[in-house]
Amino acid sequence: MSAELQDSTISAALLRAMAAGAEVRGTTSPNPPVGAVIVPPAGEIVGVGATQPVGGAHAEVMALQEAGDKARGATAVVTLEPCAHTGRTGPCAQALIDAGVARVYYLHADPTPQAAGGAEVLAQAGVDVAKLEKPPHVEDALVPWLFAVRTQRPHVTLKFAQTLDGFTAAADGTSQWITGEAARDWVHADRAHRDAIVVGTGTALADNPSLTARFSDGSLRAHQPRRVVIGKRDLASAGDAASHLRELGYEQYDSIEEALYELYATGARDILVEGGAGLASSFLKADLVDAISAYIAPLLLGEGRGVLAHPVTQTLAEATRFHRVGMKPLGDDVLIEYVR
């Protein structure tokens, strides 16, 4: 059995594994965006892997392939308990055993009945196994997937851009652009890590959005989220009002409940709701917002359109209080992130 690694080495390996998982977020659903690293006794990382799109290799297998023979006697650090079942790919726990890995650290237990049990399989094969604690102030790409598995619906993030005094558009209806280029680039990077972008029919008709994930030069990013519209108004005969969505393709559902059911059933686990005010109000009223991404611009309007179209609670005591988990300057704007 190889010597145990220092805690600092394990912590660094976990951060690298979490980063690898974050890089593939949005491309793996319905599978989780897992990251894995292989670290021999000397302490250097020799293999890094992340979950491939559905049907492809899991993170552990990718990391083992990169590590090669150096995996024997090494430590694997994985963001999710290695799976113990055979689906489209073989069980990762067995792959680690076959590679001669001496110990495995994992961040989250696998909550799915069909895949759980990898830690026990490893232990029975003589591999040392231990569960790690999440490092503070580090974004965890598995949170939406874990939530979706637990609740059987997609994790919902509400995103909006507003002025300092809370408006998303001026009195004349103009809203392009409230935020600057850095914030808009960040939005597109975020879109590329989501399974679906959701808007209401009002926004689809008024703004003619593309709902794509683009680079600053206008070119498309590698991963494009599903484009989803909620509402009963017909977009097919709307002329130029919704021409981009008709050209690119979109899904439309009559209600939030139908949308969430169908999206989950077809593999979506992590969705971004971008508006408008009516849809945002409806999601909040239904208690279906799990996180908020608020982009705040250094503008004051005094009058205009607000984030919400109608009240979602009657009293402060009844209001959902979100907790701030992140704050990021983006040029002169700032992104504030909240979770329930």
Specify the residue positions occupied by each region the protein language model found.
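Zn2+-dependent cytidine deaminase-like catalytic core
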Residues: 37-137, 282-284
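Solvent-exposed, charged/polar functional surfaces in cytosolic regulatory/catalytic domains
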Residues: 20, 66, 144
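Generic short beta-strand
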Residues: 36-37, 159
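Active-site beta-strand termini and strand-to-loop segments that position acidic
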Residues: 40-41, 150-151, 339-340
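Enzymes that bind and transform nitrogen-containing heteroaromatic metabolites
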Residues: 2-31, 47, 88, 155-157, ...
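Internal, well-ordered alpha-helical segments in soluble enzyme and binding-protein domains
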Residues: 92, 114, 118-121, 134-142, ...
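Proteins enriched for Cys/Gly/acidic motifs involved in redox and nucleic-acid/cofactor modification
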Residues: 26-30, 56, 119, 128, ...
